[in-house]
């Protein structure tokens, strides 16, 4: 998606160690117009997968997931990283390493919002190593739900996440695929 690539080139910054700072328009300050366009594009690309629900991880996956859900007419569920007091004692829980946090995080979903028989489309901000998305896949599997597609705003193809998820045999879509940070220059596929 060219408008996303342009924003990454103009405002994104490689911080080293494969970390891309895009917090001016995706994951701290959010550009609603950009997320709306991304949601439209995901809705177009995943139109035929038969999804009944969208699953993402808090916090940065929420904006693209909400706009995708709006354009697809689907509810979204986001995995929390801390269990609130309002959540039941029995939860769906898995652990996933976080590249940006530098530690393992919990991913928690209430079973009342993710159940067996659901057809789940995962939408997130990044696809890098695939660790967070694999955690979301595990939550869906624990619930008895089926993954029908995976979408990410930005993919860092050099980190191997797509390959780690290929066993699922579902469409995997990224709107901006980065092949390298060559001398801190962002290069797209």
Q: Where in the sequence are the language-model features?
A:
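Active-site-facing substrate-recognition patch
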Residues: 1-50
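PRPP-dependent phosphoribosyltransferase catalytic core
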Residues: 2, 18, 137-189
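A generic structural signal for well-ordered alpha-helical segments
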Residues: 46, 68-69, 140, 165
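Short glycine-rich phosphate-binding loop at a beta-alpha junction
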Residues: 50-58
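Structural motif
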Residues: 52-53, 119-121
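Short Gly/Thr/Asp-enriched flexible loops that form oxyanion-binding sites at enzyme active sites
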Residues: 63-72
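Short, glycine/charge-rich flexible loops or terminal/linker lids adjacent to PRPP-binding catalytic cores
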Residues: 74-120, 186-188
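Conserved G/P- and acidic residue-centered "switch" motifs that form tight phosphate/ATP-binding loops
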Residues: 125, 130
């Amino acid at each position: 998606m060219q408008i996303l690539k342009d924003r990454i080139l103009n405002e994104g910054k490689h911080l080293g160690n494969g970390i891309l700072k895009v917090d001016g328009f995706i994951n701290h300050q959010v550009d609603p117009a950009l997320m709306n366009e991304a949601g439209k594009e995901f809705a177009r690309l995943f139109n035929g997968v038969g999804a009944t629900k969208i699953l993402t991880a808090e916090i940065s996956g929420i904006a693209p997931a909400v706009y995708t859900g709006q354009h697809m007419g689907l509810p979204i569920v986001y995995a929390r990283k801390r269990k609130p007091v309002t959540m039941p004692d029995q939860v769906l829980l898995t652990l996933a390493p976080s590249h940006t946090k530098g530690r393992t995080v919990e991913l928690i979903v209430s079973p009342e919002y993710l159940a067996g028989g659901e057809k789940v489309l995962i939408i997130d901000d990044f696809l890098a190593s695939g660790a967070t998305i694999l955690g979301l896949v595990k939550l869906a599997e624990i619930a008895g739900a089926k993954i029908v597609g995976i979408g990410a705003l930005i993919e860092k193809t050099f980190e191997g996440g797509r390959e780690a998820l290929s066993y699922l045999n579902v469409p995997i879509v990224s709107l901006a695929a980065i092949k390298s940070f060559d001398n801190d220059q962002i290069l797209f596929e």
